[in-house]
Every structure is written in structure tokens, then in C-alpha cells.
């Protein structure tokens, strides 16, 4: 029975894979707005899906790249326009101070390194760039190449991973289903935790 449900869901994903570039693009735009969505999980899923449906590889890649890149720009302008109001927490300020130190030491190289760091550090890097003295044009140009580099690397690795699964595992559908469920579950859990923290703060 479980296998039947898994196959039904995977078949539904396969039959609607043409919409995946739009879905991935939209999710990454939301991530740029600080919605707790994992860019790494999306790139992983996109690469694996592309390895199974080669005809959609370019579209999926473009959806992920432009979503990630525009999401970065959104984060930059959030920092530029609203950063001082948003980051009143001491821990947030300490993180931003560290990032600003690296910007001072290494300049735009910080963007290239930061693009490979997961767990919400990316957005902090982009926002601190907006809050600092980095010019918009410099960020937009530098981040274009930083995003291109990181997405190409992660997407290629995910694509190769998907191909390896096809060779090693005959039941690749179950693995993709598990990743799909894990992404959804992680997003929901992070959202609930953040919401509970806000409720606790209001009660205090």
C-alpha cells in the first residue's frame, strides 16, 4: 500500500516536472525574503530530477540560478533598506559584525566563499553587504558570478548523484520521494519553531 502511494506521488511529480523550474524559482525568491527554505535542498532535488528527465535540465538549472540570484539581491536590499530595524538581537549583531570584518579583509571574495556556506549564513552575508558600504552595482555584478559558480558546482554534483543512484539503486523513486518529504518537513519544522519563539517573546 505504501509503495503504491509513493509511486502515485512520484508519478505526479514526473507528470508535472515542466512546472518545477517555476516552483524552484518561486521557492528561492521566498528564501531571499528570509522564509526558512533550504536552497541546498532545492538544488539537490533539481539536480536529481534533471538526471532523470534530461530534457528539462537547462530549464530547471535556469529556474534555480535566477531564483537564487534574485533572492540574493532581495536580501541585499532588505539589509540596505531595513537592516538596522531588523537586526536588534545581540546574536544577530555579533554575526553581522563578523561578516563585516570579513568584507573589510577580503572584499567581494567574501561573497564567493559565503555562497558555499549553508544554514542561513548566506542571507546574513547578503544583508550585511547591504547594511555596509558595498555599492549596489558591485554587489549585483559580483554576486552574479558567485551565484553562477556555486549553483553550477552544486547542481552538477546533484546531477551526477542522481545518475549514480540510477545505476546503483533500482528504486530511485523512493529516494527522491524521501528527499521531497524531508524538504517539506524541514521547512514546516523551522517555520513552527520560529513562530513559537515569536509567541514566547510576546508573552514575556
UniProtKB/Swiss-Prot annotation:
Pfam families xref list: VTT_dom
Protein's membrane topology: Multi-pass membrane protein
Subcellular location: Cell inner membrane
Membrane-spanning segments: 17-37, 58-78, 101-121, 139-159, 172-192
Keywords: Cell inner membrane, Cell membrane, Membrane, Transmembrane, Transmembrane helix
Phenotypic consequence of gene deletion: Depletion results in abnormal membrane phospholipid composition, defects in cell division and cell death.
GO cellular component, as recorded: plasma membrane
Keyword Transmembrane: yes
Protein task: Required for proper cell division and envelope integrity.
Family: Belongs to the DedA family.
Further comment: Can restore normal growth and cell division to a E.coli double mutant lacking both yghB and yqjA.
Record's protein name: Inner membrane protein BB_0250
